[in-house]
């Protein structure tokens, strides 16, 4: 009887490992398709495939794949439609606020800090000439922010990414 239980346990373990290997293979297959679409300069295909990867990863609660898919998808969306940056930032802000895993939350806050810093740097000339009308009220649209508001937002996300650093 014990021998049978060991065999059953071993069998279930092998099935579990096999399923996780299948998941990894399916991600590998999808990422290879993304790579081929990149080489062929097919941004719409990259966006579609990374959207599929994101949905699959979300169902499986696979945060690393979700993050990777988000970064790729957002990058290609912004190349096609630069205004998508603003929606992408809002989505990532929501994700960072609702994320329960401290490691994933820290990564998201770090990515957000980088995105805001990159935006600030690429629009520095315009921002330097902008006059703050009401410092206490931050506009919903980042295109209306002052450089001070960007610095505060970047600092907020950097601090949030390090908030649980002892446990990370």
Language model: regions and residue ranges:
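Extracytoplasmic/secretory-pathway proteins
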Residues: 27-33, 37-168
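Bacterial Sec-dependent N-terminal signal peptides
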Residues: 1-30
